[in-house]
Amino acid sequence: MHSALLRQQLAAFLSPAELPDDDAPFLLDQRKRYTSTDCVVVQPASVENVQKTVRFCAQHRIAITPQGGNTGLVGGSVAHGGIVLNLGKLNRIRHISLADNAITVDAGCILQNVQTAAAEHGRFFPLSLASEGSCQIGGNIACNAGGLNVLRYGTMRDLVLGLEVALPNGELVSHLHPLHKNTTGYELKHLFIGSEGTLGIITGATLKLFAPQQTTETAWVGLDNVQAAISLLSNIKNHFAERLCSFELVSRFALQLSAAHSRLAEPLNAEWHILLELTDSLPRHDLQDELAEFLCQNGGEHSIIAQSDQQRRDLWTLRENISAAQRSLGTSIKHDIAVPIARTAEFIEQCGRDLTEQHPDIQLVVFGHLGDGSLHYNTFFPNELGDSVYRREEAVNATVYRHVLHNHGTIAAEHGIGTLKKSWLPQVRTADEIALMRAIKSQLDPNHLFNPNKLLPD
């Protein structure tokens, strides 16, 4: 159906405000690599209008691409024909139950707004991402977002108590009760968490809340090598247990980029750096002394412990600005990978050696969540941009992913598969697993209208 005619028919049941005149903000993906074409953008302002839109599309066999904050990095919400259904107008905080430590929200709620709502009620919602000021809860769930606090609180899958989902036939499956235990058969919410919008459109969610942190200690540690970081992680997890919230790895080059971009001094001079954070829900005046003593006794004597909120913010700025610093240099080839923590040093050493032998001008920007085994293993070429870089992508990816698989890892730790990585899925999932995924997809979406050409290989 032609876009103009499609828009005209949608206007029969959607208001003008739900059919934005300016499509541009919804068409270009975050990395400016993929652009939606020949499609109509809709922003339903109610769950009922999401259902009406889905039923209309089912009747006319029109593809639907769900979209949250459009912050994804793998082309997961880019459409070629049909409808882009953006959830941004579904942005209410529906209910907070302090007794249940739960918050129920619309899928279009900005993550930061959920964090704020929880804080206003004396609670803490732990999901934390660089894009938290613009990403939406529905997208976080659809991609099973991870972020900075996985080490203590788990991924988004661990934070979801219940979901409300519009199925491809327009029916609504809703189980938003804040139950922490439920053994009545298959836990259907897990079908939709991490499904990247291919099975249903998440319209609402009930999420876990936690006690706020009363004590926070943040340290920056300089180390000679990654194996030393792994040893420190093992010891600190054993000593501080659940109080260890974050354990971030940063290479020397990644720090140099971020420090220059952020106009901040490098905290320490070392080949590898760790940013770690301890939190406690009780006031603890001795936690800093305990951390300092521990670091001195466990190879972390070359370290700084933040002495003020401003110093803590500066340390986190250095970590969080790495991606922005790299973007300012031009086109990157990015890898969102994970390997078992014990094999991280081997992966970094062997993969880096092979890449520099194959591409002498390559620059490696290595950082990420060592505490849970996931890394942002990024590359760029100082004198190349755009298509020139992408022509090298196949060879670079082949090397990186070969080492990931050799070390029993995954090619998608946090960002999902989307368009970018779907051809690689058979390398990390068995034929039987992919066949089962296809069977689930066909059962729920027999006409394959929801987020077509994503996730599953052609």
Residue spans for each PLM region:
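Active-site cofactor/substrate anionic-group-binding motifs, chiefly glycine-
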Residues: 64-66, 71-73
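N-terminal flexible segment immediately upstream of the FAD-binding catalytic core
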Residues: 1-55, 72-101, 254-263, 309-333, ...
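Activity-critical C-terminal alpha-helical subdomain
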Residues: 171, 422-458
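Small/polar glycine-rich anion-binding or flexible loop at a beta-alpha turn
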Residues: 253, 370-373, 411-423
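C-terminal substrate-recognition/cap domain of FAD-linked oxidoreductases
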Residues: 20-24, 207, 217-222, 228-392, ...
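N-terminal accessory segments
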Residues: 1-31, 59-62, 295-312, 406-411, ...
